[in-house]
Amino acid sequence: MSRLLVLKSSILGDYSQSNKLVDEFINHFDHQQLVVRDLAQQPLPVLDFQVATALRAAGELTAEQQAIVTLSDTLIDEIKEADTLVIAAPMYNFTIPTQLKNWIDLIARAGVTFTYTEQGPKGLIEGKKAVIVTTRGGIHKDAASDIITPYLKTVLGFVGITEVEFVYAEALNMGDDFANKGLASASEHLAALTA
């Protein structure tokens, strides 16, 4: 049995292929606890001056700053309580959705999820796995245009999550035959992860 934290970031709601694939995965995954956070339906604040200063503030906080820190703490606690993160990360203009980036900006906190040492940065969230389901209109895996894979590997590794599995559903806008093959390939990969 496992505890899952599911992050959906597609703006397409019920039309989202990444959400459908993630739902398929969690329906077949043996889990005892499930937390689903739809970052498009319940958007998080954008990293701006107010958010950045709140997350770096020392000492007295304003009510607004405290609310931001409390939200960040909640998001981090969700990660700490999970064994596996399942992240739906569709490709929008070669990168992740803004909604997912907002989540990253709130959980990447010096002294909380990572620290700087004499040997360099060290992630403080350990013993977690991540499954990234990424959908794309074209074919980008292993190409220079795939910015998502190295970015998410880097940022998750930076906070200590180094066991990361990517599931690709590609060619979804290249006609029905390509789309069906891309979705079938992703479904097979997800099924293998639940076996």
From Swiss-Prot:
Family as reported in the entry's similarity comment: Belongs to the azoreductase type 1 family.
Described purpose of this protein according to its UniProt entry: Quinone reductase that provides resistance to thiol-specific stress caused by electrophilic quinones. Also exhibits azoreductase activity. Catalyzes the reductive cleavage of the azo bond in aromatic azo compounds to the corresponding amines.
Residues reported to bind FMN: 10, 16-18, 91-94, 135-138
Highest taxon, organism lineage: Bacteria
Gene Ontology terms, MF aspect: electron transfer activity; FMN binding; oxidoreductase activity, acting on NAD(P)H as acceptor; oxidoreductase activity, acting on NAD(P)H, quinone or similar compound as acceptor
Cofactor annotation remark: Binds 1 FMN per subunit.
EC number, UniProt record: 1.6.5.-, 1.7.1.17
Cofactors, names only: FMN
Claim: Membrane is one of the keywords in the record: no
InterPro entries named in the record: Flavodoxin_fold (IPR003680), Flavoprotein-like_sf (IPR029039), FMN-dep_NADH:Q_OxRdtase_AzoR1 (IPR050104), NADH:quinone_OxRdtase_FMN_depd (IPR023048)
Catalytic reactions on record: 2 a quinone + NADH + H(+) = 2 a 1,4-benzosemiquinone + NAD(+); N,N-dimethyl-1,4-phenylenediamine + anthranilate + 2 NAD(+) = 2-(4-dimethylaminophenyl)diazenylbenzoate + 2 NADH + 2 H(+)
Subunit structure: Homodimer.
Name under which the protein is recorded: FMN-dependent NADH:quinone oxidoreductase
Pfam families registered for this protein in UniProt: Flavodoxin_2 (PF02525)
Keywords: Flavoprotein, FMN, NAD, Oxidoreductase
Flavoprotein keyword on record: yes
